[in-house]
Amino acid sequence: LVPGITKEFNDIDEAMRLGFNWAKGPFEMLEEIGVKNFFDKVDEYKGNKFLENLSNSKDENFYGERQKYTSIETLGKIKKTASSVDGNSSASIYRFNDFNIVEFTTKANALDYDSMDALKKATDKPLIIINESMQFSAGVNLTYTMEFANKNDFKSIEKFIKYFQETCKHLKYSKYPVISAPSGLTLGGGFEVLVQSNFVASHTNIVIGLVETIVGLIPAGGGCKEMLARWLNTEEAKKDPKYAPLKVFDIIGYGRTATSPVEAEPLKYLLPENKRIMNRNSLLEVSKKILNENKDFKAPNELTFNLPGKAVIDDMNKILEKLYNDKVILDHGLTVAKELAHVLSGGETTKDKTLTEDDLFKLELDAFMRLIETKQTQDRIKHTLATGKPLVN
């Protein structure tokens, strides 16, 4: 195996631990036994060049000094050494000398007001958003949202969405860099946190996307805004002002998801510069390395948008008319899609008018609030929470 498959013993140990759920790899165990004890128990090794060389070496340990085994620094290990622990019932903040970590702690790491509060409080230093559980975040906590909707307390929902937007903008333009290190589900609001982080170190096992339309809503935490920005930054969009809104309309409208970084990149859920990590246990180490490489970090400039308004709405309506006539979407599906179209078009604007990020946030918020107040969207959410399946209405 060494050096035929890999040059490092660590790689073999890592593969055996991850593949067979072992506590220690074979070379780690031999390291603990020691070279002398190992050969005291081995009867035949003549003819095996590797074992002969090892037997003749003067190393006391199996790895030797140069290849001494060093375990990977995972979240589970490092958080025990935090200088302080802060947070609430939805997220924990682990504070270290030169950076902070936020770990979501709700079921499926669904996001609520407290989750956002923890993120905002943790930006007083460079921040890594990472979880020990298998999911990054399944999105906004719909149960939390419906508790307010059932009481017709839509002002509380609006307050939460505004705070979500405010927090995500704060992450993006913080004095210090923010890194998201996702694994598993990274959907809806979870994606919106990621896309407004400054850096991404993504596990290759990831399910990522904006799926709000499935439950009768539209992304309202910056998802529409950021996807527009990414697609506007293409050669096609520079030639055709309708290109980016139509592309994002298709992606968000169908609730498209990707199941790997390779699939996510063509949708622009992830970008070429985002790190991809095969070993989930290495997410924290890679994130810390990114921080070390960006000591001179400066926050990006705020985005501006020039969107075509009614000119692209007409094209979107033609698409929706065909889908509706073909019964691909029903009455409320049409309503949701029209709200999405209004946001992505820029609303009452023309391509000569410049919109700010706050303008796009306002469009997202208004559309979200109009939808959450409808019985049909509430029916979709209740059905999904009860069955785990979408309701088509």
Predicted regions and their residues:
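Helical "substrate-binding/catalytic lid" subdomain
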Residues: 1-41
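Intrinsically disordered, low-complexity segments enriched in small/flexible residues
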Residues: 32-130, 232-256, 260, 266, ...
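Short acidic/histidine-centered micro-motifs embedded in hydrophobic/aromatic stretches
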Residues: 15-19, 267, 387
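Conserved catalytic cores of soluble enzyme domains
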Residues: 157, 165, 169-303
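Flexible loop/turn segments at secondary-structure boundaries
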Residues: 23-24, 109-111, 135-139, 186-190, ...
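A structural preference for short, pocket-lining loop segments at secondary-structure junctions
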Residues: 97-103, 113-155, 162-181, 203-207
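Glycine/serine-rich phosphate-binding loop and adjoining beta1-alpha1 elements at the start
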Residues: 28-32, 39, 54, 61-64, ...
